[in-house]
Amino acid sequence: MMLSVPTAFSLGPERRQEQFSTIPGYLVFPAPYVFPGIGEGLMLVGYSGNFLETTIDAYLVGFSGDAAGLVGSVDEVFVVPELIYFSGWKFNISKYGINSYSSRGMESEKDDFNIIVGNKFEMDIFKVSLSLFERRLEAALLSQSQYGESHKILDSKGNLLNEIDPPQTFQGKKEGIELQLDWTDDFKDPRTGLRLKSTYDLNTSEDADSPEYYLTSHGLTFYQPVFGESTWAFHFFRSDAKVRKEGYTDLKTALLAEGLNEENATSCSYAPTSQACAPYVNKAQNTINANRNGTAHPLGGQDRLRSYPGNRYQAAHTLFYGTELRWNFDTSTEVLDWYFFSDVLQALQATVFWEQGSVSEEAQDLGKITRSSYGGGLRLVGGSGNTYRFEISTGEEGAEMIVMFQYPWRGEM
């Protein structure tokens, strides 16, 4: 006999707590920042979970100093209780820097990058989600747009290499569909069960020179309960780009986009291996590969390959897998109420993890060259729905410290 959809979901692990909690929590703290090639200043971080005892979560980072601007988000704004909700993200930064490595793929060195600096970066993300069966099934539609201006190129130490005059503008738009099957005992803090999240995005071209491609990503996580109230998580992730329309693939055009003038771009297109031209040609080849093959979900940052900076490894295909032991050594319910922080403690958690990943331009080359991360940390699982993370991760290029407000392996945007 065929089971109905509600019956099939009811056979999964029983939810161990309310899935639409309204327990409030907040965190506010200032912190200095120093961004190579940009400058320094002060940022103020603010988070409010289940704002005013609703399901709404709000997050805001304000920057003062050389990188003035703000990053903010709101999540779980239900317009139909326990059924339909909105989420949104806003980025508005007056000065930014992006690391651009000498080559896509896995073979660039740690300091083999330039910093692309711009005076403006804006990004808006809007998502509407349908939630069913106590959040065991969620489907979402997503829209994202971004705009930026690049005006100079620095080396990895912050020294000026080239001025881009007039500034080079870039813009992009993405429309996506998300589907998540959550066959676990809790949506925000799972300890047993299985979770599958799939995304399907169309990155549209804003002009004739830009590529247009589909991006499919799938993340599968299995949670094995251990030590009573703890869990051992195993995660697999795959992301693939498929180009529908190529962008420009001409070397001279790509060199002009790197900031070279007409004369130098022409010279380097005829002598790409010369010592003076090679760095620019390598960067131009990155652009050509991106325009020809598209770009899958990158590796690096707080979500996957945590010992590497964000977007460290990029190509048309991505493979990632990892495991993480989450030991909840204190699960007593305690109210924490300080001036800068308030929440209900649900678990104090120690974690150790290992991760490995690979990217490549051709799918058959995935796994030929890999990079790994391993580390550990402490977490506080709050009743407001947030998981406050402090971790140290290390790998082939050194160590990274992570301070974050959600579990890893969740982001596919």
Give the residues covered by each predicted segment.
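Gram-negative outer-membrane beta-barrel proteins
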Residues: P36-E40, L52-T54, D66-A68, V80-I84, ...
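Transmembrane beta-barrel strands of outer-membrane/channel proteins
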Residues: P32-V34, L44-G46, A58-S64, F86-S108, ...
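C-terminal outer-membrane beta-barrel translocator/porin domains of Gram-negative envelope proteins
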Residues: Q180, F187-D343
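Transmembrane beta-strand segments of outer-membrane beta-barrel domains in Gram-negative
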Residues: P13-E14, Y96-T249
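Residue-level signature of outer-membrane beta-barrel architecture
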Residues: V34, S48-N50, E76-F78, L130-E134, ...
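Outer-membrane beta-barrel translocator/channel fold
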Residues: F63-S131, G158-L160, A233-P298, E397-Y407
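Outer-membrane beta-barrel initiation region
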Residues: A8-G88, A140-L142, D165-R191, A296-R306, ...
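Outer-membrane beta-barrel "beta-signal"
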Residues: I177, L378-L380, G398-M413
